[in-house]
Amino acid sequence: LFAFWPCCVKAVRVLSSPEDKGKSFGWFEGARGVASAIMTPLAVIAFRFGMNADGKHDIAGMRQVIVFYSVITVFSGLLVLWKMRDDGSKIDKSEQVTFKDIGTVLRMPAIWIIGLVTFCNYVFTLSVYYFTPYGTSLLGMSVTAGAVLAAAKRYVTPVSNVGGGYLADKFGTSRLLLISFLVMAIGTAAILLLPLNDSSTIVFVIVFLIIYFFYNVNYPLTWAMMDEGAIPERVSGTAAGIISTIGYLPEVFVSLLAGALIDGHPGVAGYRMFFGFLIAMLLLGAVFVVVWQRFLRKHGLGKGSAAKTEAQAGAQPAAKDAAA
């Protein structure tokens, strides 16, 4: 991920038009969701094939899964090499990113706000795995129903990713982000208020799928924020790396916190404490989106700002040459 992820984000920005950033990142994340939904059952087949071929040993099955994903990775790399070619022009020295540019990016307020929005959204990414155990252990939902719900998430993902991208381009990225954070927080609170019996199962499933839909609306839009904040495409890779460093920090502590709370306080108490933390982080995400909206208004930024800023920057040297 060190070099791969920033390259992906920059490629999507460069290949998409200023008016279609939301749709572009929505299709990007949606396609990843479809690929995941396809590859997961294939990986299970590879695992079973390995076990059957070697006396039903788990190690043999895992070996086949590793080989399967390795082949997919190599194939994807060759596909990129074939389809995504450079135009042959050399990068001008003025366009090359230097260590000075890294410092410039770090001083951009937009980078830190986007990073904090991503941080709050990623807390939910790591927390989503605890909803199904809550349903099965406390609401009486069957394990089979829990497995079906977990599988259904994979098919909600591409629909919400792509749909969210179109809605963002129509109504505004920051507005949709704010709505999504609030819906996720309210939905999580509603789940905590459900009676602890099997009569709540259907409501739980419906509310969870609504929450998950809006979470996947949010996920690609955090990257579309770069265009609103006038972050130059030239430094997109650097910006994505810094945003990811900030935004993915929950990876360090969320799972540990969940384990400590849920195991340390058996029953509903641990889940209430952890989901309470999650609600607080979602509301904090909404606050950061409001800060973002004020930042955009203060600086006269918004949809297509990056393209406008770069066009103005490119026009200045041309005007000087013409005057000379």
List PLM regions with ranges.
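C-terminal transmembrane helical hairpin of 12-TM major facilitator-type secondary transporters
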Residues: 174-222
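C-terminal membrane-cytosol helix-exit motif in multi-pass small-molecule transporters
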Residues: 48, 70-90, 288-293
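Extracytoplasmic gate region of multi-pass secondary transporters
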Residues: 36, 109-161, 219, 254-255
